Amino acid sequence: MSFVGREPRARAAAALAIAIGILASARSPHASAFASRDDFDASADKFAFESTSSQDAKVDLSAVASIDAKAETRALWVLRTSLTTPDHIAALVRSARDNGFNTLLVQVRGRGDAYYLGSVEPRPAELLRQPDTFDPLESVLEAGHAAGLRVHAWVNVNLISSATDLPAAREHVVYRHAAWLMVPRDIAQELATIEPESPAYVGKLARWTRAQPNEIEGLYTSPIVTEAADYTDSIVRDLAHRYAVDGIHLDYARYPSDRFDYSRPAIRAFRSAVRESIPAATRRTLDAEEAVDLFAYPDALPDEWRSFRIARMTALVSRLHATVKRERPEALVTAAVAPDMHDAFQHRLQDWGGWLEAGLIDAICPMAYTTEPAKFAEQIAAAREAAGT
């Protein structure tokens, strides 16, 4: 993984350590190195940086320390499973420093929960054995800054719950605001007959999600639903306001696939956005069809529907960027993105090329997960070209 961006301080080349353990090096003044990654949740402990000395690691992390670049960003993804005790935090900071890293991307919102104090979101079960005063993010900030490391808060934007293990806390957003959840086309008609307040709604969505493990990681909130976007923005604003973070790292700022979001609120929002721009006769026809077909408007206007969903995701990213800069102007705002810009746009409705072009993000981190060095180099080169670096 690497930071790739148009901002001079965020530009990157290919001094990279990716989660699966491939190490490459280069001489860019702003290269970056990453290890451990949330997309591998099923084996999170394997990738968590909580046990590690350099000899335990998948790669010889000490090699990173020898890269000669004064202004380099050598960043490490730190899973939330590494933040559960003060000892784990002390060990990860020490290991990161000793192995040449200078930046930690610390996962503080993994599944609509809070690995920090004072949030409206619930404290995760993994922290229940710790004192109520234990604040993982503040602990990393104190130890990391003392060790000369930069610390970014890593936030999962839309992914807010596992479908396999639904949240135990009843105040979780999944239960309080089920209407905010993204819905796949496959079961949208059926879910439209169930009130979101009913346990059957989340139950049906979770069962479908569990049956699609290769397509979707869990339950997502929708960037189309205004209240959901407001909520996500409030989480990021609170983090940037109360904690001396050096950056906010956005993950899962995308749709699971282009088969989402066919929820009732999303389709209503689309209808409202396009009704005045279509002929009155077409409008009357679609209104009549919608009474029996939830997909009347999206199916009649497929290009507009795709563009609308992409635009709403972009609008949320833009909003989060503006919020962070308002609260903490010097903080970087970065995003983990699908490595192929065209695939991200077509299949994840994630326009990260547009984000960079418009200055809505300071840098991207391409999720170049492969054991093939040639493919890895190709993906990073394509991302650099798209970013103009």
Task: Go through the PLM ranges and name each one.
Residues 83-97, 228-238, 343-357, 376-380:
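Short, acidic/polar
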Residues 47, 59-86:
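Boundary/entry segment of secreted carbohydrate-active catalytic domains
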Residues 112-156, 310-327:
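Aromatic-lined substrate-binding rim segments of carbohydrate-active enzymes
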